[in-house]
Structure formats: C-alpha cells, structure tokens
C-alpha cells in the first residue's frame, strides 16, 4: 500500500470510529487496530488523533458546504428551497458518519464547525431572500431574520431525522418545504403580534 493509500485508509477508518465512538471515545490505538497497523503509522501521517480528526472534519465541512451551495445556485425560489432541503437530508442519509461527526462531536474553539457552516448557509439564504423581499415590497434588511429561521428549522429537523429516520426523506422534505414556502408566501409586509 502506498503512503497516499494508507493515509486515505486511515481517514476512512478514523471517520467511522469518530462517528461511532465520538472524539473523546476514540483512541489512536483503536484506529490503528482497525486499520491493521501500528500506532506509529497513525502518528506518522497525522501527528495524533487531533490531526486525523481535523482532516476528517475539514473534509466533511467541505462536502456539506458544497452540497448546500450547489443546491442554492439555480432555480426559482421554491426550487432552491426544495433542492437545499433534499440535499441536506440526502447528505444525512448517505453520509451519516460525517453528519454525526459534524453535529455531535464539535470541539470548542474549532475554526470550522457545523455552526460556522450554518452561518455560511444563513448568508447564502439571506442573500436570496433579500432579492425576493425587494420584489415583494418587504424590507430587505429583514432577510437575515428569515435566513436564520429557515436554516435553523432545516438544520434542527435534519438532526432530529438523523435519529428517527421515519417518515422517509421525501416526506420530511415535503413538509419542511411546505412550511418554508407557505410561510414565506403568506408573509405580511408589516407583521404585528397578537393580531394587532
């Protein structure tokens, strides 16, 4: 096995172990044993558990960021919402280990975390909403509030669905999109609390 192949093997095994045991529960010894190598091989490639974890998190961040960005690039407003919701739920379903690592095992002080990824998504969604708000006569400066709400709703539901997996992805996506779209389409230009 070449050095590059060994590195990729360790990343793959590390990803699975971090998802299964969490950062704190994972040891270099466990990763090495599952890879069929000695601990010094892991240290040689990554300097330790922290180095391997950083590579795994960075790859997952880039993958999920691309999924979100790609889903928001084209289409009508509704299509973008549908594409983004389906993309995130598909990632949760197909890349469960990666999603688990991002949402359940974030280390304090990490520069790149699920929280920073969500902030980036909020920026993208808010930008799209600003354009839509201008067309509807709604103050575009309020787009950030709605961007936070929409991304938070999708993110929280995706985390819930990670454990539940019922109903299936399409049903969950349909209901998220229904709430997002119909909530946005029925927006009042100057909303008030309590029906005032």
Which residue ranges define each predicted feature?
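Amphipathic alpha-helical segments used for helix-helix packing
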Residues: 91-112, 126-130, 159-163
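Helix-turn-helix
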Residues: 9, 13, 17-51, 55
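Alpha-helical DNA-contacting segments of helix-turn-helix folds
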Residues: 30, 51-60, 102, 117, ...
């Amino acid at each position: 096995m070449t050095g590059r192949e060994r590195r990729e093997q360790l990343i793959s095994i590390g990803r699975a172990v971090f998802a299964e045991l969490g950062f704190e529960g994972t040891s270099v010894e466990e990763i090495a044993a599952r890879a069929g190598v000695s601990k010094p091989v892991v240290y040689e490639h990554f300097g330790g558990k922290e180095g391997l974890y950083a590579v795994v998190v960075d790859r997952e961040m880039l993958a999920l960021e691309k999924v979100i960005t790609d889903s928001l690039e084209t289409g009508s407003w509704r299509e973008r919402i549908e594409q983004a919701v389906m993309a995130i739920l598909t990632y949760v379903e197909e890349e469960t280990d990666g999603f688990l690592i991002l949402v359940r095992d974030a280390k304090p002080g990490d520069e790149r975390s699920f929280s920073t990824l969500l902030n980036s998504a909020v920026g993208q969604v808010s930008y799209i909403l600003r354009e839509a708000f201008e067309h509807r006569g709604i103050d575009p400066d309020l787009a950030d509030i709605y961007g936070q709400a929409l991304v938070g709703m999708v993110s929280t539901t995706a985390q819930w669905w990670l454990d539940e997996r019922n109903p299936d992805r399409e049903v969950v996506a349909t209901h998220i999109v229904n709430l997002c779209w119909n909530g946005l389409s029925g927006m009042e230009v100057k909303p008030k609390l309590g029906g005032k």
